[in-house]
A protein has these predicted regions:
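Conserved donor nucleotide-binding strand/loop of the catalytic core
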Residues: 75-88
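N-terminal glycine-rich phosphate-binding loop and ensuing alpha1 helix
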Residues: 8-65
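Active-site nucleotide-sugar/metal-binding loop of Leloir-type enzymes
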Residues: 92-107
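Residue-level signal for inorganic ion chemistry
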Residues: 14, 31, 40, 97, ...
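Conserved core of the sugar-phosphate nucleotidyltransferase
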Residues: 117-208, 245
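Acidic helix N-cap motif at the loop->helix transition within catalytic regions
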Residues: 66-71
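SAM-dependent methyltransferases
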Residues: 3-11, 193-194, 212-214, 222-245
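Structural beta-sheet core signal
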Residues: 12-14, 58, 110, 135-138
Length: 245
């Protein structure tokens, strides 16, 4: 646990059961390597570093289980990482992981497998915000003009000040996200992120300021920027090590 004063558990769920067809590779995007390490492992490292997190649930396709097991053996993470068979959709994968959650779970943090530039600080902030309000996400303002369109015709322009582009991590009190997922499944509703499931039940979701560096690696054009960000992270880590010498 996270100290004597914290009696409840904080879980991270990393849905990684997608095929990654937009990347145009036979290898699922979460297992593409950058600096010799799969993207999903880079992401797991951040959650392993986050003091707020007690354990991690990684949702996978059955055919990726062995590959993930090998990577976890190589990494030897300090925190427990549980491999969970995923579903046909992200929402189903998260629901299956929630079914495995221990009874003393307080907060659930859901994060994209291919957002490896999340910081432990962001993870901590999301957990603290969820403790206060019940649900919290990160978002960044839209710098582009956003149009509402139907059949290739503009219906209107949405004011940019009312728009945020949602990111993960998204954190929730356990009972809130569990009920939202259960209700969505019962109603046949498939949301694009977890916060949308809470919204449809009338739940309030706090928005925290996200980061332009917290990119989601989904297509080939994202890879050069990701490599640049990793190089910068390595340089920063080397500078910190020199200062500690």
């Amino acid at each position: 646990m996270n100290g004597a004063l914290c009696a409840m558990r904080v879980l991270a769920i990393i849905p990684a059961a997608g095929a990654g067809v937009r990347m145009g590779s036979e290898t699922p995007k979460q297992f593409l390597s950058i600096d010799g390490v799969p993207i999903v492992v880079h992401t797991l490292r951040k959650f392993n570093e986050a003091e707020t997190i007690d354990e991690i649930y990684l949702g996978l396709r059955p055919e990726d289980m062995e590959r993930a097991h090998v990577e976890l053996q190589r990494e030897q993470f300090q925190k427990p990482v549980h491999l969970v068979p995923g579903g046909a959709t992200r929402q189903q994968t998260v629901s299956l992981a929630l079914q495995k959650a221990p009874s003393d779970t307080e907060i659930v943090v859901v994060h994209d497998a291919v957002r490896p530039f999340v910081s432990p600080e962001m993870i901590h902030l999301s957990v603290e915000a969820a403790r206060k309000s019940g649900a919290a996400i990160f978002g960044v303002p839209s710098v582009d003009t956003v149009k509402q369109v139907e059949r290739q015709t503009i219906l209107g322009t949405i004011p940019r000040e009312r728009i945020v582009l949602a990111q993960t991590p998204q954190a929730f009190r356990f009972h809130i996200i569990k009920e939202a997922c259960d209700r969505a499944e019962a109603d046949g509703y498939d949301g694009t992120d977890e916060s949308s499931l809470v919204e449809r039940l009338g739940g309030a979701v706090t928005v925290l300021m996200g980061s332009d560096r917290n990119i989601k690696i989904t297509k080939p054009s994202d890879l050069p920027l990701a490599r640049l960000f990793f190089a910068q992270e390595h340089e920063q880590a080397e500078r910190r090590e020199k200062l500690l010498m």
